[in-house]
């Protein structure tokens, strides 16, 4: 484990490696984003500080490298900013501002790159927006009501080789959102209406759902994990009839609020971070039960 000291002047809310694991982006309540070059296993060199937000920056997300060196960020200031590094000068600049929300933008997430450059944003105004960055340099967006009290996070459904062959990619745009209404919801794009339609409601938590994460498509089954203020994590999977069923990650409640959940790249390990400043790792056993696979403090 590596500790990066004195990186920000306030709380750090997110830290994400790029596609190749060569650069680390962090964001903070100090309103800045920091970029580090990863040199070896223990050396992180600060190379850039991005200044553009007017409030705490909650989350950052790297686009797939096929689109260039592009980073999205979201903030309490109600904006999502798109940053790009110019290859010739290696200087970063804002290439787009997404300002359709009326409150804090809480998360940003790029769609699977096969679908194109598409950014999903969630906000405390209760709305979700999906921004398409077109090849001609223009942008278009769809914004809709998702969770009345506020949307906290979202995660795209993975693409598998089976569901992309011979199909219009618009038909497989799906993602899951979670909100302060204690719910998670699955949305699917309807190209005939140019709108996202509610496909399923995942009801099982008794307090705000803080994070949601859809597992990668490598697995035979597809899982969704939801982490909640109620100190539980639920694992959702579809039965043979396509209905989503829930399972408690662990029968015992977590010591504190569950803030974030994240699947490993292979999709077989789930990491959960909580208000007790610990990260716990979980793995499914052969009986279909989830068991502890370690802890990071």
From Swiss-Prot:
Molecular function GO labels: structural molecule activity
Subunit structure and binding partners: The COPII coat is composed of at least 5 proteins: the SEC23/24 complex, the SEC13/31 complex, and the protein SAR1. Component of the nuclear pore complex (NPC). NPC constitutes the exclusive means of nucleocytoplasmic transport. NPCs allow the passive diffusion of ions and small molecules and the active, nuclear transport receptor-mediated bidirectional transport of macromolecules such as proteins, RNAs, ribonucleoparticles (RNPs), and ribosomal subunits across the nuclear envelope. Due to its 8-fold rotational symmetry, all subunits are present with 8 copies or multiples thereof.
Disulphide bond pairs: none
Protein name per Swiss-Prot or TrEMBL: Protein transport protein SEC13
Sequence similarity: Belongs to the WD repeat SEC13 family.
GO BP terms, alphabetized: COPII-coated vesicle budding; ERAD pathway; mRNA transport; nuclear pore localization; positive regulation of DNA-templated transcription; positive regulation of ER to Golgi vesicle-mediated transport; positive regulation of protein exit from endoplasmic reticulum; positive regulation of TORC1 signaling
Role according to the record: Component of the coat protein complex II (COPII) which promotes the formation of transport vesicles from the endoplasmic reticulum (ER). The coat has two main functions, the physical deformation of the endoplasmic reticulum membrane into vesicles and the selection of cargo molecules. It also functions as a component of the nuclear pore complex (NPC). NPC components, collectively referred to as nucleoporins (NUPs), can play the role of both NPC structural components and of docking or interaction partners for transiently associated nuclear transport factors.
InterPro entries reported for this sequence: Sec13/Seh1_fam (IPR037363), WD40/YVTN_repeat-like_dom_sf (IPR015943), WD40_repeat_dom_sf (IPR036322), WD40_rpt (IPR001680)
Lineage of the organism: Eukaryota, Fungi, Dikarya, Ascomycota, Saccharomycotina
Signal peptide segment: none
GO terms for cellular component: COPII vesicle coat; endoplasmic reticulum membrane; GATOR2 complex; nuclear pore outer ring
Topology of this chain in the membrane: Peripheral membrane protein
Localization (cell): Cytoplasmic vesicle, COPII-coated vesicle membrane; Endoplasmic reticulum membrane; Nucleus, Nuclear pore complex
Gene: SEC13
């Amino acid at each position: 484990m590596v500790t990066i000291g004195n990186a920000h002047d306030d709380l750090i809310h997110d830290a994400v490696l790029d596609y190749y694991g060569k650069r680390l982006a962090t964001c903070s309540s100090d309103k800045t984003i920091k970029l580090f070059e990863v040199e070896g296993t223990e050396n992180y060199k600060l190379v850039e500080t991005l200044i553009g937000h007017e409030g705490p920056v909650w989350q950052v997300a790297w686009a797939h490298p096929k689109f260039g060196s592009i980073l999205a960020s979201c903030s309490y200031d109600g904006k999502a900013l798109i940053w790009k590094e110019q290859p010739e000068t290696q200087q970063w600049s804002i290439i787009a501002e997404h300002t359709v929300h009326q409150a804090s933008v809480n998360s940003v997430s790029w769609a699977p790159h096969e679908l194109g450059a598409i950014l999903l944003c969630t906000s405390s105004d209760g709305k979700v927006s999906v921004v398409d960055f077109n090849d001609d340099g223009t942008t278009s967006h769809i914004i809709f009501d998702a969770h009345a009290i506020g949307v906290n996070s979202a995660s795209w459904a993975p693409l598998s080789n089976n569901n992309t062959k011979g199909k219009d990619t618009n038909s497989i745009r799906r993602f899951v959102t979670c909100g302060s209404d204690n719910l998670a919801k699955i949305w699917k794009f309807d190209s005939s209406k140019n709108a996202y339609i509610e496909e399923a409601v995942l009801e099982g938590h008794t307090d705000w759902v803080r994070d949601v994460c859809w597992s990668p498509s490598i697995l035979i089954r597809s899982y969704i994990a939801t982490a909640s203020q109620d100190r539980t994590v639920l694992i959702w999977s579809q039965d043979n009839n396509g209905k989503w069923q829930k399972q408690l990650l662990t029968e015992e409640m977590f010591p504190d609020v569950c803030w974030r959940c994240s699947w490993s790249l292979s999709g077989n390990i789930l990491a959960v971070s909580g208000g007790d400043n610990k990260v716990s790792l979980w793995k499914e056993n052969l009986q279909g039960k989830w068991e502890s696979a370690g802890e990071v403090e």
